[in-house]
Amino acid sequence: MTTNYKVTELFCIIDEFCKHFDAENTGNLLEDNSGVKRRRRAASLSDSEIMTILLYFHFGTFRNFKHYYLFFIKGTMKSYFPKAVSYNRFVELESRVFFQLMFFLNLGAFGRCTGITFVDSTMIPVCHNLRRYANKVFKGIATDGKGTMGWCHGFKLHLACNDRGEIIAFVLIGANVSDKDTNVFKVLAKRLYGKLFADKGYISQKLFDFLFEDGIQLVTGLRVNMKNKLMPFYDRMMLRKRYIIETINDMLKNTAQIVHSRHRSVSNFIMNLISVLGAYCFFDNKSKALQGYCIEDTKQLSLF
């Protein structure tokens, strides 16, 4: 379990962002011309407190959000959140901070492209394969797809990270969408430049040409049945550093619990997903590829 200092750190960063976010939006939002009166009543918990509670859940050892909220937030951390509402009310308030949390990820939490980017996809199952026909929450939304670990009913998460282990961008698609789909990279590669290192599942001449037009060089390994070709020594070494993106996927699933089958609505599934990505940005044990940009500093030459 993390220390109470982490709660204070998270809240201060998020609250400062929410103040700037609200100041920018004041008077700039579109008016509601539907004629329906809205009270615009403030909740007992502020938006920054709701976001802090959502993110802090993924730092601890709790496997169940309900127990975390009832016994930890309303119990141990009662002095930090004296106006905590009931659990049912908090679940209703989660979706209120969706836009604030998305803006916070893109403007205040995610890293920036350094010219060295790693990309990978991971399956996000929503239920067991045998229960996919009985699942009603994601009926018509989740799809069946096959990955390296077998068949999956759910979604596929594409992640792009830099050499410091910081997430740059993400895309959530159906599980049956190919990794080589250019529509995925129309969103994923908006902020990228330089070299993009990927596994063999991204080998596609169409995708390579699409990225090259935007100034991005796709670097992948070679399949067994492909002709051998010369590759710069630096690119070969950086392909070995793809463990960074694999480590991120492992931390998201095993530490931050991005995958579980207890979702009762699509909106809560989305809130859990972006909360996990936001919490990872504040993890202290991120993997790094390079201490500098010199290959000798990584001591990879000793492998030969």
Predicted features along the sequence, with ranges:
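Short alpha-helical elements
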Residues: M1-F304
